[in-house]
Regions:
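N-terminal beta1-alpha1 ligand-phosphate binding loop
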Residues: 1-27
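Loop/turn-to-beta-strand initiation segments
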Residues: 2, 98-102
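General small-molecule cofactor/ligand-binding pocket signal
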Residues: 6, 34-36
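Short glycine-rich anion-binding loops that position phosphate/pyrophosphate groups of nucleotides
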Residues: 11, 75-78, 106-109
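Conserved strand-to-helix beginnings and helix N-cap segments that scaffold or border functional pockets
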Residues: 17-20, 82-86, 115, 135
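S-adenosyl-L-methionine/SAH cofactor-binding core of RNA-modifying enzymes
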Residues: 32, 39-98
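Proline/glycine-rich low-complexity loops and linkers
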Residues: 105-106, 117
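Structured adenosyl-cofactor binding patch, chiefly the S-adenosyl-L-methionine
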Residues: 112-156
Length: 157
């Protein structure tokens, strides 16, 4: 089984890049994990929000493989405490055969076809975060889940 974080647009700020890469590497000690970047759309000034979401949606769908289990990071998704998320991840590790793909959409969210392609939605908070920051929050929580499942010293209850 492989874990993939699919994001729209590259991470820009250096301090986020450094921290994200650190947690990605730490997480790889436990699981097969990678982060794939879908390039940002260019020349979007003449596109409506809906058109932009549709175009991003087409690129997201092209990045998915048959058999992927798709989980959207979405403000309307299920919320977990860290231990609950770790338990959810553990269940997925026993039931997903190919890739578990977490997707962070563009600035306007997801096109309807992406919601249709997803099996689940999870929310990392009721608060709103930048798309740059949420990447770091997610990879930190995935790493935390791995340390919880492996009785590591990182997480404290």
């Amino acid at each position: 089984m492989k874990f993939t974080l699919l994001v729209v647009g590259r991470t820009i700020e250096k301090h986020y890049i450094t921290a994200i890469n650190d947690y990605v590497e730490r997480t790889r000690h436990f699981i097969s994990f990678d982060m794939e970047v879908i390039p940002e759309l260019k020349n979007t000034k003449n596109l409506s929000m809906e058109q932009q979401k549709e175009k991003e949606g087409e690129l997201i769908l092209k990045a998915l493989l048959p058999g992927d289990v798709v989980v959207l990071l979405d403000e309307h998704g299920k919320e977990f405490r860290s231990v609950e998320f770790a338990n959810w991840i553990e269940r997925k590790m026993h039931t997903v055969n190919k890739r578990l793909v977490f997707i962070i959409g563009g600035p306007y969210g997801f096109a309807p076809k992406i919601y249709d392609a997803a099996q689940e939605k999870i929310s990392l908070s009721k608060m709103t975060f930048s798309h740059q920051m949420i990447r770091l929050i997610f990879v930190e929580q995935l790493y935390r889940a791995m340390t919880i499942l492996n009785n590591g010293p990182y997480h404290h209850e």
